[in-house]
Design a protein with these regions (language model features):
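Anion-recognition interface
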Residues: 1-233
């Protein structure tokens, strides 16, 4: 990237955002599921500190600006507004992002997980399915702190070295969401009745077909209903 930009500009500045690690891991797992089946056996190598070392080496530390990705610290909760402000550029309403991506709810991730068990590869219908699932209410998707520690592959000093370089903390209250956090793939496969009713209500047509929800143990039938979410109403 530097070799491409250097002839065009006298100076190149880098602005990069980093989430706290547990939040990043939860977001990354959802993204994996959106594209393919993802087990909870594959560890997460987040490599925050190494990434910054590479940026410092290539662009020069004085040209590398690191920001914490935290919507509560952005003007109006908008990352685009924060980025423009960091560049001392006027914030035009038309330039702001239209919505803040909060991710899928826990019930939506559970349904997506079951769908992926039987449809492990990306299909043309997947984007429409994920869009439908994005409207599903419920608790936010969170990892239990024990699962987070199990999946994190970073070295013991990774967070310290990162925070020392960037000047802000990415430390989280790792147990804050343990009451709703998943511990294993078994938790993902336990589809509650409320989620089955949501599937039934979403797929049933007024004056037409009424979809009867399957038994919660019949995961193949649940996956088939999730696959039907791409069909127009």
């Amino acid at each position: 990237m530097k070799s491409f930009l250097a002839p065009l500009f006298s100076r190149v500045e880098i602005h990069q955002y980093f989430r706290p690690m547990k939040s990043r891991m939860e977001s990354a797992y959802q993204e994996r599921l959106k594209h393919r089946f993802a087990s909870l056996e594959k560890k997460f190598h987040l490599g925050y500190n190494r990434r910054i070392e590479l940026l410092d080496e290539i662009f020069g530390r004085e040209n590398v600006n690191i920001h914490k990705y935290d919507a509560t610290e952005f003007p109006g909760g908008d990352v685009v507004a924060h980025f423009l402000s960091a560049l001392d550029l006027p914030v035009e309403q038309s330039a702001l992002s239209q919505s803040y991506n909060e991710g899928l709810s826990l019930p939506a991730v559970q349904l997506l997980y079951v769908y992926r068990k039987f449809n492990p590869s990306l299909t043309p219908a997947d984007r429409a399915i994920v869009k439908q699932l994005s409207h599903m209410p419920g608790d936010p998707f969170r990892f239990h702190s024990a699962l987070y520690h199990e999946l994190l592959a970073n070295g013991p000093n990774a967070v310290f070295l990162f925070e020392q370089r960037v000047g802000f903390s990415i430390t989280e209250n790792l147990t804050a969401d343990d009451a709703i956090g998943i511990r294993s793939e078994q938790d993902l496969a336990e589809i509650p009745q409320q989620s089955l009713r949501w599937l039934s209500d979403t797929l049933s047509r007024p004056g037409g077909t009424t979809v009867v929800p399957p038994a919660d143990a019949d995961l193949s039938a649940v996956a088939a209903l999730v696959a039907s979410l791409h069909e127009p109403g």
